[in-house]
Amino acid sequence: MAYPGHPGAGGGYYPGGYGGAPGGPAFPGQTQDPLYGYFAAVAGQDGQIDADELQRCLTQSGIAGGYKPFNLETCRLMVSMLDRDMSGTMGFNEFKELWAVLNGWRQHFISFDSDRSGTVDPQELQKALTTMGFRLSPQTVNSVAKRYSTSGKITFDDYIACCVKLRALTDSFRRRDSGQQGVVNFSYDDFIQCVMTV
């Protein structure tokens, strides 16, 4: 079974991790990664950022464009999506991965915001999710749309929160679906951990 954002699936807005030295030049004469300046401006001495720092970093970088800056809860979701060691923080390589994903999702949002209102409606969300490779029932899409819309409109921030949660839950499901059959068995505790850490 193909999963959205993974090899064999349509869409492909979820690039993999990045190797190499965080931010700084690896060899004399090599230039510093331009994203490192945004990251280093808010990172502590441990070289990690938490959700508060990520929110400041993304706001200062202007990645949201003309849209409202990301709220703290959306930033918490972003950190948890990439927090593989469950530390509540992300390093520079995870930040670079997030940056690439956010840019892809932003372009995707813009392409579905046909009236340039800064929002998408539930039907546009359904089309967007389908083009990203998510094969969800109409009932599930309706539930997702209700969860992330206000007065029938989904803002950029809520769209990103929705994408982050869908990716994180799909990744968690995929890790447990070793036979790639689209079906897994969860213990209650495992289910709660899976859902609450997203």
UniProtKB/Swiss-Prot annotation:
GO terms for molecular function: calcium ion binding; DNA-binding transcription factor binding; protease binding; protein heterodimerization activity; protein sequestering activity; transcription regulator inhibitor activity. InterPro entries: EF-hand-dom_pair, EF_Hand_1_Ca_BS, EF_hand_dom. Residues 45-64, 70-98, 100-135, 151-169 form the EF-hand domain. It comes from Mus musculus. The modification Phosphoserine is found at S178. Ca(2+) 2 binds at D113, D115, S117, T119, E124. It is a peripheral membrane protein. Calcium-binding protein that modulates excitation-contraction coupling in the heart. Contributes to calcium homeostasis in the heart sarcoplasmic reticulum. Modulates the activity of RYR2 calcium channels. GO terms for biological process: calcium ion transport; negative regulation of cardiac muscle contraction; negative regulation of heart rate; positive regulation of release of sequestered calcium ion into cytosol; regulation of cardiac muscle cell contraction; regulation of cell communication by electrical coupling involved in cardiac conduction; regulation of insulin secretion involved in cellular response to glucose stimulus; regulation of relaxation of muscle. Detected in cardiac myocytes. Keywords: Calcium, Cytoplasm, Membrane, Metal-binding, Phosphoprotein, Repeat, Sarcoplasmic reticulum. Pfam families: EF-hand_7 (PF13499), EF-hand_8 (PF13833). One of its GO terms (cellular component) is Z disc. Its main location: cytoplasm. This is Sorcin. Homodimer. Interacts with GCA, RYR2 and ANXA7. It is found in: Cytoplasm; Sarcoplasmic reticulum membrane. This protein has been shown to bind calcium with high affinity. Ca(2+) 1 binds at D83, D85, S87, T89, E94.
